Regions:
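A conserved mid-domain beta-alpha-beta active-site/ligand-binding segment of alpha/beta enzyme cores
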Residues: 170-224
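Conserved SAM/SAH-binding loop
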Residues: 102-110
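Oxidoreductase and adenylate-handling cofactor-binding alpha/beta cores
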Residues: 162, 229-244
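Phosphate-binding loop/pocket of nucleotide- and phosphate-handling active sites
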Residues: 1-14, 238-298
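ADP-ribose/adenylate-binding Rossmann-like module
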Residues: 120-161
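Glycine-rich phosphate-binding loop and adjoining beta1-alpha1-beta2 segment
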Residues: 50-93
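A short, basic/flexible loop-to-alpha-helix module at the beginning of a structural domain
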Residues: 2-31, 218
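Hydrophobic/small residue at the entry helix of a nucleotide-binding pocket
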Residues: 37-38
Length: 298
């Protein structure tokens, strides 16, 4: 069957102008990490009519991915996420040129390689060091990057332009202005762990296991992942069209889907700082105690 582009995206027109839709058709977007946020984003950009899509991931789908990741299905277990994302997104955007890249992001050069030629980047990778590497690569390549994450019941989305505030600066990463040494990588992972515990809405029993390293997974839900993806793709549309209000740093979206309201980044930052100081000063058990105190629990 032949698919007519104009007919397939025709109902976008009215919210988008034909001229804006043509820009979208000629735009290349790189989605790095197509597990949770990235899988939902891949479908959304295809449905919106983006003509050139790069999907990047090193992993294969497994049974536990089903709770969060759109393309984790009974017939995709053991298959690479990038290749599956390419096939699935093509069903929603048959006119799109979709490239799958099976690659682990272990350096800024790796990050640059998977984003060459892109006009926009949506970063949905989980690893703290890889997120910093993606941020640095985007600035070197002068490509706007949207950092998106679903963290328990909450989501965070922020947009970073080449001449604006970087993700590292926006989130006060310990790597800012430093080489990504093993020691800095350890600090990044610790801060990420504390931040996740501070914001996610985990149960106290899970937090104790999470801090002690007794669980091999981070607890996720599908609904926040889809919401974070929606917000990320929406950022790209606003950047392209100039419509609406973007979340360009120092702005950012931190939303609580459990209580349906925005979270105060300063409050989250102070909570994270207190727990970090406790962990670094007296160890994990003190960090757990401080987490409970900051959550109003005994």
């Amino acid at each position: 069957m032949d698919y007519n582009y104009e007919e397939s995206i025709g109902r976008n027109i009215g919210l988008l102008t034909p001229e804006e839709q043509e820009i979208i058709r000629n735009t290349t977007i790189s989605i790095v990490g197509v597990g949770g946020v990235g899988s939902w984003a891949a479908v959304m950009v295809a449905k919106t009519g983006f003509g050139h899509i790069i999907v990047v991931d090193k992993d294969e789908y497994e049974l536990p991915n089903m709770v969060e990741q759109l393309f984790a299905k009974t017939d995709t277990f053991g298959k690479t996420k990038a290749e599956v994302a390419k096939q699935e997104a093509a069903k929603h955007g048959p006119f799109a040129n979709i490239k799958a890249v099976v690659k682990d992001i272990q350096s800024v050069d790796d990050a640059k390689a998977v984003c060459q030629g892109a006009d926009y980047i949506i970063c949905g990778v989980d690893d703290a060091v890889a997120r910093v590497q993606m941020d640095r690569a985007s600035r070197e390549l002068r490509i706007p990057i949207i950092m998106a994450a679903n963290i328990g019941w909450r989501i965070t989305v922020s947009t970073h332009t080449p001449d604006g505030i970087s993700y590292e600066e926006h989130t006060h990463q310990p790597s800012l202005g430093k080489e990504l040494s093993p020691q800095i990588a350890e600090s990044l992972h610790l801060q990420q762990k504390v931040y996740i515990a501070s914001i996610a809405g985990f149960t106290p029993a899970y937090v104790e296991k999470f801090f002690r390293g007794e669980v091999s997974y981070i607890s996720y839900l599908a609904v926040p992942a889809a919401f974070a993806a929606s917000a990320a793709v929406n950022e790209v549309l606003k950047l392209i069209t100039g419509k609406g209000k973007t979340n360009i740093s120092p702005n950012g979206l931190t939303f609580d889907m459990l209580n349906m309201g925005h979270l105060d980044p300063k409050e989250i930052g102070m909570r994270t700082y207190r727990i970090m100081q406790a962990v670094m000063g007296k160890g994990i058990e003190e960090g757990i105690k401080t987490w409970k105190e900051t959550r109003g629990e005994t």
